[in-house]
Amino acid sequence: MAPPVIEEYLGSRPSMERCVLLRAQRRNMTRVLNFDRKLFLSLVVKSRRRFFKKLGGSEKEIAARIEEYFSRQRRLEKLGQILTVLELQSVIVSEFTRTLGSLTTPTPAINAAVRRVDAPRARALASRALNSYAVLPPPEEAAPMARHKHSDLVEVVKRLVKEHLRRHNKRCVCYGSYALHLLNPEIEYGDIDMVQTNARPFLINLAFLIYFVTGRQTVLLRVPYLKNYVVLQDEEGGHILDSFNVRQATLRALPTLLVDNIYVLHPFVQLMAMLKMFSQTDRIRDLADNFDKARARMETLLAFALEELGEAPADGRTPLPCAFLPPEGGASRVLEADARALDCGFARAVVFLDEPALVQTLLDMGVQDDEIVDFESVSNSAFLVRDNTLFTYFSNTVLMDGDAVHDLSRRGVSAHIVMFLLLTRHPAAEGAVRSMLGSLVSDARPVTSVVERERKTGTHGVIDIAKNVITH
């Protein structure tokens, strides 16, 4: 005889085989059956009023969608689809009130710190720095950077995400264009970039909030070559929101700045990330079409740095000397950087262009897990300091000037090393940033060849509400 909770959840008596397979899910079924849908409906309706304005349906339509989804399992035949619906219902039951429902409660009185930078102060330096990136010949065929198409739901979601960043600022950190907008309101921004400790349940609940309020179907994708990255798309593949998930310990360790009660990734770290990014060929070519946008972002970061550290020195100690190590059995994809100028506790950095090669090297060295520092998607690499050497991974292309590593890639590798110092709060970190400020402009020597970045492979994970599918 089937346990009563299984019969009640399915709305029918299951076969003995199905009963055995579902027995382990009795606790989740009980929680779903006991879920207060009237209270949930009131939270969804409040969310519609606060964030969706005129976009949402009537309360009657919302109630019908909620009732349909919480009884959907009764109309399904495939066990896999039933388990998918139960898993997603369980996420709503356990997480919605904490992640999204709480955003509808009155805002507590907060004296939020506001920080604005004098961006024009750094405009000339930013322009000279970016002009020195004109080092690539025009492509034979126009190949603009692949950009995702934005959904018409982005503007609605932005209002909600801003409130999420303020209310839950112990669980999420903002970076990118919106973080810079908080420092310089002249910065335009599209979607809002963030890392958080509960990215998957947050986006699942957001997907259901959109569905219950508007009837719009959305899909969540997990991209295999980006660490713990989840993106929410509309029914036509339009980009709504993405987020990186990080461990709580990682989030607590990140250097941040509190602006308008939102924690933003420290501008020094974001500046290093930007300099790393410009070792990438598609980013350099994109400057030709989006120079003003890039300059506005760089001058904002530079203005913050100049205010904190003083004027840039006339001659910085970076970019660090870099060269490829002699190959072992093939073309070398390992760089060595001379880090002595940073006076930071290690004399050199061994920089792998292939992450599996770094992992294998650490295994061969017998490294223990607690010796490795990893800031997940923020640094996009683990770090180890041993025997006066930093071991790490660089995920961008390396530009060459003849047989030598080009200044721009030396700067990118140097920025990666300085980012490590910043993330670990090393005493030499701020001095290293100041040195970078004094070496942002180079002579724009042409790039003669490119060492490609590592190509990562894998299959996308999908959560499709309409099709009742979860693939990992």
UniProtKB/Swiss-Prot annotation:
User: Which EC number(s) are documented for this chain?
Assistant: 2.7.7.19
Q: Which reaction does it catalyse?
A: RNA(n) + ATP = RNA(n)-3'-adenine ribonucleotide + diphosphate
Q: Provide the alphabetized UniProt keywords.
A: ATP-binding, mRNA processing, Nucleotide-binding, Transcription, Transferase
A single Gene Ontology MF term assigned here is: poly(A) RNA polymerase activity
Top EC class of this enzyme: transferase
Which interval of the chain is the signal sequence?
A: none
Catalytic residues in the record: D191, D193
One Pfam match, by short name?
A: Pox_polyA_pol_N
Q: Which GO terms describe its biological process?
A: mRNA processing
Q: How does it assemble?
A: Heterodimer of a large (catalytic) subunit and a small (regulatory) subunit.
- Function statement: Polymerase that creates the 3'-poly(A) tail of mRNA's.
Per the record, the similarity remark reads: Belongs to the poxviridae poly(A) polymerase catalytic subunit family.
Q: What is this protein called?
A: Poly(A) polymerase catalytic subunit
Organism encoding this protein: Orf virus (strain NZ2) (OV NZ-2)
Gene designation: PAPL
